[in-house]
């Protein structure tokens, strides 16, 4: 139970932070704002994060929350390609409506410069578990070329999505809503 509560507290802090970053901008958001919005304490904030900058690596957590929300809506009768297209589209709709291009650019640059953990590549994320499940089901139905490794399909799809995000940032956010598989 304590682990679940700590995950909820950390999650509330992350969700509140990204909401405020989008509404007020990163520089316009203070730790006090985040603590107030999350309904937590400064002690809780600093228990999980060294400071506001530490939240930059948590966007993958926000993305994973979106994937968790999408899981019950996935139609098991749809093919893998259609399901991948759906989750891709839904994530990008969420990004356009709640993640500023400046923040996404910062996240991608911190991931490029990170010497330690690269959150976007963490194979234990909900994202990768969901991709593996979709690809496995597609392979079982014969939707992919025989001999094509499921892990390679997952890796290629994840790489393609990161490339889209990077290119969207490079282009100033002009076209994300036009991207569909």
Where are these regions (language model features)?
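Alpha-helical DNA-contacting segments of helix-turn-helix folds
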Residues: 49, 56-63
């Amino acid at each position: 139970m304590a682990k679940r509560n700590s995950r909820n507290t950390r999650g509330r802090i992350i969700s509140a932070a990204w909401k405020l970053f989008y509404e007020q901008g990163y520089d316009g958001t203070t730790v006090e704002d985040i603590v107030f919005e999350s309904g937590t304490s400064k002690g809780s904030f600093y228990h999980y994060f060294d400071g506001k900058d530490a939240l930059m690596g948590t966007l993958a957590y926000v993305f994973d929350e979106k994937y968790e929300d999408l899981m019950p809506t996935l139609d098991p009768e749809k093919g893998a390609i259609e399901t991948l297209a759906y989750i891709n589209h839904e994530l990008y709709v969420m990004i356009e409506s709640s993640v500023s291009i400046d923040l996404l650019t910062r996240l991608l640059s911190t991931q490029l410069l990170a010497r330690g953990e690269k959150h976007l590549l963490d194979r234990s994320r909900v994202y990768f578990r969901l991709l593996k499940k979709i690809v496995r089901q597609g392979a079982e139905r014969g939707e992919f070329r025989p001999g094509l490794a499921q892990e390679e399909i997952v890796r290629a799809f994840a790489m393609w999505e990161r490339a889209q995000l990077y290119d969207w940032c490079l282009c100033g956010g002009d076209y994300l809503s036009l991207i569909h598989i």
